[in-house]
Amino acid sequence: MAHDRPETHKSGCPCCSPYIWEAYQLRHPGLSRRGFFGAGAALTAAGLALLGGRKDAAAGGLATALAFTAPAFAAGETRRSRLDAAEGITVYRGGTIRTMNPSAPLAEAVAVSGGRILAAGSEADVAARAGRDAKLVDLNGRTMMPGFIDCHGHISMTALLMGFQNLAPEPAGPIRSIEDIKSELRKFRERTGGGRGGWILGAMYDDSLLAEKRALTRADLDDVSMDQPVLAYHASLHVVVVNSAALSLLGISADTPDPKGGVIRRWPGTREPNGILEEGAITLAMPRLPQASREELLDLLDEVQSRYAAWGITTAQDGATRRPDFDLLSLAAERDRLKIDVVAYPFFTHIEDLARGDIEMQRDYNGFKVGGIKLMLDGSPQAKTAWLTKPYEVVPPGFDKEYRGYRIVDDETAASMVDDAFARGWQVYAHCNGDAAADQFIAAIDKATKKHGPGDRRATVIHAQTLREDQLDHMARLGVMPSYFVTHTFYWGDWHRDSVLGAERASRISPVRTTIDRGMRYSLHNDSPVVPSDCRMLLWSAVNRQTRSGKVLGEEHRISAEEALRGITIDAAYQHFEDDIKGSIEAGKLADLVITEQDPVRIPPDELRNLTIAETIKRGETIFQA
């Protein structure tokens, strides 16, 4: 049946909608507001005190001889205590050190002290700075790089969904068919002793990859249970599916109207709900979902950080942060439970909280800070809710052939929010998957720039899937960065080509090559929990642009491994206004480092996704070791 299209859409994924995030608030109420940590100044000062120019190598000749004739540490002996990281000096040598510093891209050795990089360069120069008592770590031919930065994602939402059964398709999960989904949901009931708060919960199923090639419905979930409510999130997080017991519990029936900005899908030719709740209709389910405790969420956050560290990530992002998420992350920082740094970009509905100082904007932090604000201007292409200038290749059921997705806010509202951010000196991100949404954001930036004058604002187009060449030209003039969700080429490339955008537009998604050709800075991200925050997949996807079926999508937009590394190191740090302390291996910067068994620049491009992470180091301390 046909559905009226609302003028503006409120999508249901963490990167494009208030709806799922309202669910998160319901999941952990009562979290008190925590201030940012102000501790750590002494550690930083200690590191900075060691800086100052490179000393003459001749003056340290004896130290050089003594230091580099000492026995090397074995790979298994590289884990250091907090005391060693804070007070000792450690020298790494004996491998490939890719600094990501364009003026000195390779180094022979790196010295680390007080959580900072003391020196990087030749063995002789580094040994002179480090002195005879420095600890030596032999890289044994491995490769050291700056720690990876996944500069757009939703780490708090990722933690929440860790408590759901994984319904993702391979390689992120075990699902190939609807029968697999049923089996996994039954496993959830078994391992939780009957469900969580009576509910059976799963997330990240993707109907475009199911053997049955159809959407999940209440009938499928009724096979899991007729007595307990069952809920499954779609991979886009724009849709949930519930069973008959859940519909009854939620009071959703044939008489229930579609809520504003959402759709209750019905069985063909009837008004009877089929269990699929889209966009704004998701909010009908949220108040009845079980709530996670503060301690449960902290434990889940610990687990997520361990995964990030195992992927070489030392800085992550919490995009579209809500107040409960801010409180959770602040609490984690206060309890010293952040292994990695987290930069938050509160949802635009919290502009007033920021203006009042209820949520503090600051550049300095101890593990957690607020970096700016995030606007949501459209939805997602895989769910066909991204706002495009031309119709979808295959329109969703119930919409006319000119369907192009939805805007979230009107032009005046978008311009007003950007103007407010400029006036207050806040960095602004905007979620723009569709080129129409990008047009809206670029126009708002242009208008605000004319009013407030040029400046180093680093406004960023998040996802940037369908940016046109003329838009890149305009962005370059305005100093606007794109941050590409480049793994779309693998996860949904075939879907985009065959159903979402058509062959021509699909070949141009994530146009990183022409971005580089313009001399623009850019970043690459995974948008977790939409896909796992594995930066190796970012490298592999950007370099190969290969779909699940093995087809190359837009060969002309392939980039080199070195260029891809920029997008998760120095340029990603630049996006966060942190390129002065992160993103490259240079004296004075944080000792955020990753060691890999292979050199990503030298291995065959197809092996990038299998790059072996040997060790991840955060502020001089090992947080992961294989």
Where is each model-derived feature located?
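Phosphate/diphosphate-binding loops
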Residues: 341-369, 458-464, 503-517
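Acidic (Asp/Glu)-rich catalytic clusters
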Residues: 335, 361-364, 476
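N-terminal secretory signal peptides
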Residues: 1-35
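Non-cysteine beta-strand/loop elements that form the S-adenosyl-L-methionine
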Residues: 368-384, 480-489
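Divalent metal-binding segments
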Residues: 82-93, 98, 102-356, 375-437, ...
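His/Asp/Glu-enriched, well-ordered alpha-helical/loop segment
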Residues: 418-429, 436-459, 463-464, 469-473, ...
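C-terminal segment of N-terminal export signals and the immediately downstream linker at the start
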Residues: 30, 50-101
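N-terminal secretory signal peptides and thylakoid transit peptides that target proteins
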Residues: 23-44, 51-60
